[in-house]
Amino acid sequence: MKLTFLGANHEVTGSCTLLEAAGQRYLIDCGMEQGKDVYENQPIPVAPGEIDGVLATHAHIDHTGLLPLLVRNGFRGRIYATKPTAELCSIMLRDSAHIQEFEAEWKNRKGQRSGAEPVEPMYTIQDAEAAIALFRGFDYNKEVELAPGLVIRFVDVGHLLGSSSIEIWVTENGATTKLVFSGDIGNLHQPIIKDPTYLKDADYVFMESTYGDRCHGPKPDYVGELAKILQRTFDRGGNVVIPSFAVGRTQELLYFIREIKEKGLVKGHGNFPVYIDSPLAIEATRIFRDTDPDCFDEATRALLAQGIDPIQCPGLRVSVTSDESRMINADREPKVILSASGMCEAGRIRHHLKHNLWRPECTILFVGYQAVGTLGRTLIEGATDVKLFGEAIEVRAEICQLTGLSGHADKNGLLAWVNAFSPKPKRVFIVHGDDEVENIFTQTLTDEGFTACAPYNGAQWVIGAEGAVCVQEGTRVRVEHRPSEGASRAATVFQRLVSAGKRLLRVIEHNEGGANKDLARFADQINALCDKWDR
């Protein structure tokens, strides 16, 4: 079998690995890069139409966001995931496509004035719908045979509703090898969802390392800390604006706010309004409510058994339309605004930042990881002004973080997860971490007695009876400058053309042995197309 590391190697976003085994080709995740591009993701070395399927570890866009593009370029296989992941992707991929279309439309309106070449979205709502139709959802802990010699199982990893590690059994030449892809390993004691499941055996492990160089410390008093932030901000007459990931983090915060209101922890503002200003978050909250309770932790199941909705509180309001969103900032009553995206790169949160960043009485509260190069990271690093919608905005609001609130395991959590394997895996491949973090965590595992390495994007490894051998090193050339938007779009469109060419070649090979009359007509059509475009 062969594995090609395509994305999220020595960086955190854009997860994608190609597994070629038992005569099949499967991608494990197909994610979009977000924030600063450190190492260029490598193109998939085969035409999308030649890929048999995709295994999705969870619904976050940095793990699934390029699935519509894969379909646009010719992929027609199945996408395998847990049932909650399939449900969440049905809303998240539509939302991502909407953002792609909106941004392309905005750039084209702006470009008309300067005579710029029109741009097209990376993918469309139609592409997202086509990808969603390919999903197949499964329960946890159920073995699924993808093909003879290829069996998988999803195991709860406690990162997000529906998140999973994926066990893969590959049988070739009468010998079975077990791979485990960790997915994003969850932090302990998160509200609503269960803690990560520890697996016992694997030959080769592919594990994330987001926080492989640090410890979260003792579990914070999330409810108490959040209540203090709300109290001092409301006492100043300001809003608490929370850039929040629509799926997972928003529901956790609603869980905390319900408890704050239930216990009366904010004095003098007991009925403060809480706005969910994200259509995606509203839909995600509905999916959380409709999910099988077996996916939730013991405390959440206990609340449900008492008839208590764990993510509902007095004063909760939702904003679906753009007009409803605009009205939030017209209301001067102190309030909580939960809006996406969590890293402030897109979505309605940018409008709320524009209206609240310059107000010293307000607080911008970050509650999740902020990738290098994102607006969120810029703000927590102390920027004094930022540009939003072409306008310079002075940063006068209080900027703070709810520390320790993370969906990712820290160094100790990662070590607990990997140390559960007995005996130790033959090799651990470290992925999904910032450049230096991957190096540090690889050394940590080496010191613990593991054989570990951190491949770069483009690396290829062959696994056989003799073990794992690197047959191609990945690229270590850093991206010094993000390519221009136009160049990036052009590269995407050209890649579609290349994929179409590869698909055409497959169709030609498939027609070998056909009737001469049909083959001649097919050849004439191809030649006519070539004559038209050979310029």
Question: Where do the protein language model's features map onto the residues?
Answer:
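A polyampholytic, Gly/Pro-enriched intrinsically disordered region
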Residues: 100-105, 292-306, 469-495
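Hard-cation-handling environments
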Residues: 229-374, 387, 422, 437-439, ...
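Short, compositionally biased "basic patch" segments
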Residues: 191-206, 293-300, 370-396
